[in-house]
Swiss-Prot record:
GO terms for cellular component: helical viral capsid; host cell; host cell nucleus; ribonucleoprotein complex; viral nucleocapsid. Keywords: Capsid protein, Helical capsid protein, Host nucleus, Host-virus interaction, Ribonucleoprotein, RNA-binding, Viral nucleoprotein, Viral penetration into host nucleus, Virion, Virus entry into host cell. Residues 1-21 are annotated as: Disordered. Residues 8-21 have a biased composition (Basic and acidic residues). This is Nucleoprotein. HAMAP family: INFV_NCAP (MF_04070). It comes from Influenza A virus (strain A/California/10/1978 H1N1). GO terms for molecular function: RNA binding; structural molecule activity. It is found in: Virion; Host nucleus. A motif (Bipartite nuclear localization signal) lies at residues 198-216. Signal peptide: none annotated. GO terms for biological process: symbiont entry into host cell; viral penetration into host nucleus. A motif (Unconventional nuclear localization signal) lies at residues 1-18.
Length: 498
């Protein structure tokens, strides 16, 4: 059951799951992009945005959030049943930034959700186009992964902040479907499961009755998704144990944390896709590009080519560095928050620095921030090379990593060794080898101890020139091994607050 995800490409998960050939998949993904682009153009018209304002990433985020909110049925139901003061459950909105008399002004807009849904459906040939919505959710998730470190969330569930490389997709909404599940990291799945088990421990009725049956099947489904991410038999067997537990409790939480730690060395397979902001798709569609006809893939050269020819702007706070803001967004566009920085620097063609060294805060501007001192600048989102996104964790080996992040989760299928700090990881595995899962634990620890520093992952895979669309001449990069490979190194990134 768990392996079915590995047999379908994500483009198929992104579509309706039936097997399609490459051309059909490319057309189908292209159609989704067309829909987002058409919707964005229409929204810019509604809001009377100039071309420059329409290419402002903050405006894009507001418009994306509005349509996601308009289609969030569960939350909409909840808002109608629990009316809160000053919040109209039928409306959605946010800040739109306009250039007035040489200054940036913030304007709070409010729309009927019904109206937004109508515009979205119209842009998508009458469909709800859930795939396009999920695509935008993944873009927001990738941006969060690049901007914030989930230290608090990790500590709250009893995990270690150094495991942040396992947390891809930790802010994705639950309704993000199969495409969303594919991009979630091992740590994210473990955290969701631990939260569930803790609720069960604290609330006697959580697993009982009609609702309890639904809860139970959600629990088993999540266990299976996590199992499908693991690449070794022992890790998978451990997930079977957790899934089959009659009454999940602390033993299961222990097993889950153990399996998450083991994933720092025995990495799980996590999908990566380049999801771009709507303000990239809009202008491309407006210029007459037909994504459905031309075909599009989230895991090949297409997003790189699109970014080479796109102009995106961002608001910049007084003490922020525009180049650093560009790096943040570039990494988010390629789902590369947990990739090795040496490789990212090579692909991008400019040095990619750890989060703590960047003079930039998040992309979104809070409502209480002063607009008088806001400037805007062009985001540099181009790259020197392109590479194929991976959904495997790569095989394992070792190199000294840092205090902040002690492993990577590869984004690109490119030959290199994968840094992780073996001594730090292994130090966490003292003690507990008794209990039902003892043989699996012993086996997992043995495999981790056998992981060799000199082993190369993705052997023979390289990056490609942007002119090499068919990926015929791989260029295998060589790295300076003395350089720091982790993005959240000894980090001081802000916390993500929901």
């Amino acid at each position: 059951m768990a392996s079915q995800g590995t047999k379908r490409s994500y483009e198929q998960m992104e579509t309706d799951g039936e097997r399609q050939n490459a051309t059909e998949i490319r057309a189908s993904v292209g159609k989704m992009i067309d829909g987002i682009g058409r919707f964005y153009i229409q929204m810019c018209t509604e809001l009377k945005l100039s071309d420059y304002e329409g290419r402002l990433i903050q405006n894009s985020l507001t418009i994306e959030r509005m349509v996601l909110s308009a289609f969030d049925e569960r939350r909409n139901r909840y808002l109608e049943e629990h009316p809160s003061a000053g919040k109209d459950p039928k409306k959605t909105g946010g800040p739109i930034y306009k250039r007035v008399d040489g200054k940036w002004m913030r304007e709070l807009i409010l729309y009927d959700k019904e109206e937004i849904r109508r515009i979205w459906r119209q842009a998508n040939n009458g469909d709800d186009a859930t795939r396009g919505l999920t695509h935008m959710m993944i873009w927001h998730s990738n941006l969060n992964d690049t901007t914030y470190q989930r230290t608090r969330a990790l500590v709250r569930t009893g995990m270690d902040p150094r495991m942040c490389s396992l947390m891809q997709g930790s802010t994705l909404p639950r309704r993000s479907g199969a495409a969303g599940a594919a991009v979630k990291g091992v740590g994210t799945m473990v955290m969701e499961l631990i939260r569930m088990i803790k609720r069960g421990i604290n609330d006697r009725n959580f697993w009982r009755g009609e609702n309890g049956r639904k809860t139970r099947s959600a629990y088993e489904r999540m266990c299976n998704i996590l199992k499908g991410k693991f690449q070794t038999a022992a890790q998978r067997a451990m997930m079977d144990q957790v899934r089959e537990s009659r009454n999940p409790g602390n033993a299961e939480i222990e097993d889950l944390i153990f399996s998450a730690r083991s994933a720092l060395i025995l990495r799980g397979s996590v999908a990566h896709k380049s999801c771009l902001p709507a303000c990239v798709y809009g202008p491309a569609v407006a210029s007459g590009y037909d994504f459905e006809k031309e075909g599009y893939s989230l895991v090949g050269i297409d997003p790189f080519k699109l970014l080479q020819n796109s102009q995106v702007y961002s608001l910049i706070r007084p003490n922020e560095n525009p180049a650093h803001k560009s790096q943040l967004v570039w990494m988010a566009c390629h789902s590369a928050a947990f990739e090795d920085l040496r490789l990212l620097s090579f692909i991008r063609g400019t040095k990619v620095s750890p989060r703590g060294k960047l003079s930039t805060r998040g992309v979104q501007i809070a409502s209480n921030e002063n607009m008088d001192t806001m400037e805007s600048s062009t985001l540099e989102l181009r790259s020197r090379y392109w590479a194929i996104r991976t959904r495997s964790g790569g095989n394992t080996n070792q190199q000294r990593a840092s205090a902040g992040q002690i492993s990577v989760q590869p984004t690109f299928s490119v030959q290199r060794n994968l840094p992780f700090d073996k001594s730090t990881v292994m130090a966490a595995f003292t003690g507990n080898t008794e209990g039902r899962t003892s043989d699996m634990r012993a086996e997992i620890i043995r495999m981790m101890e056998d992981a060799k520093p000199e082993e190369v992952s993705f052997r023979g895979r390289g990056v490609f020139e942007l002119s090499d669309e068919k990926a015929t001449n791989p260029i295998v990069p060589s790295f300076d091994m003395s350089n720091e490979g982790s993005y959240f190194f000894g980090d001081n990134a802000e916390e993500y607050d929901n």
